[in-house]
A protein has these predicted regions:
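Interdomain coupling/hinge region of P-loop NTPase helicase/AAA+ cores
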Residues: 1-16
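Soluble catalytic regions of large protease machineries
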Residues: 12, 22-28, 34-236
């Protein structure tokens, strides 16, 4: 059973008829998120995985931090971005195709990567500078001086930001694919268990994957890199 917070985050379960092929794809998609959540250093614990549709999602991987967070480390952000790519990477590894199911995941990853580059000064290329538009200046006459009301930088910097965000996302996607290829057996085991039981809690996830003692992998730096009490639910 889902607890109250999980139900609030995931939304109510809903009845939806899916083909065997689509249901299998959802199982691998969510399995990809969960496997990476088990493997990546700094990732929030994987509390539950389900292929029961909730809200607008066909399946959900639910992760909750063990302690309240008021700032985020680079390692944690790395795990969040790579983990968000896990569903798409699993579909690529298993089915060699992509679907629209990763739209929300990619949006989350893109938003986070852009904040790392523009808000938190975590780009080696751009350096320790905040490039996000500042709030509170609209209507003050400062907009045209670059103080809010738009982008406080030129087109060359905008291009550099886009390039850094793209690099972060491509590196994260490559790492997600590499890890799931390495741990294909664990991915297959988890997908099979999801197809049989639909919803798995943490002990069941560990049994299905054989990852009873989680072998955290060494992080592959994204070469940029931030810092609430934040609950992550990665939905397909």
């Amino acid at each position: 059973m889902l607890d109250a917070l999980e139900t609030l985050v995931l939304g109510p379960a809903r009845a939806l008829v899916m083909s065997v092929e689509e249901r299998t794809r959802v199982a691998y998609h969510e399995g990809g998120h969960a496997i990476l959540g088990l493997l990546l250093p700094g990732a929030d614990p994987v509390n539950r995985v389900t292929i029961v549709p909730h809200g607008m999602a066909l399946g959900v991987t639910y992760q909750r931090p063990e302690d309240d967070r008021h700032s985020y480390s680079e390692q944690y952000l790395h795990a969040r971005i790579v983990g968000a790519m896990g569903g798409r990477a699993a579909e690529e590894v298993v089915f060699e195709t992509h679907t629209t199911g990763a739209e929300n995941d990619m949006q989350q990853a893109t938003d986070l990567a852009r904040q790392m580059v523009t808000r938190w000064g975590m780009s080696e290329r751009l350096g320790p500078v905040t490039l996000a538009p500042r709030d509170g200046t609209a209507g003050t006459g400062l907009e045209n001086l670059g103080f809010g009301g738009g982008k406080p930088y030129g087109s060359a910097t905008a291009d550099a930001i886009d390039a850094e965000v793209q690099r972060l996302l491509e590196e994260a996607a490559s790492e997600a694919t590499r890890l799931l290829q390495t741990h294909r057996r664990e991915l297959d085991g988890l997908a099979a268990a999801l197809l049989e039981h639909e919803t798995l809690d943490e002990p069941a996830i560990r049994r299905a994957t054989g990852l009873l003692v989680i072998p955290r992998v060494a992080p592959v730096p994204l070469r940029t890199a931030v810092g609430s009490n934040n609950t992550a639910a990665t939905a397909r």
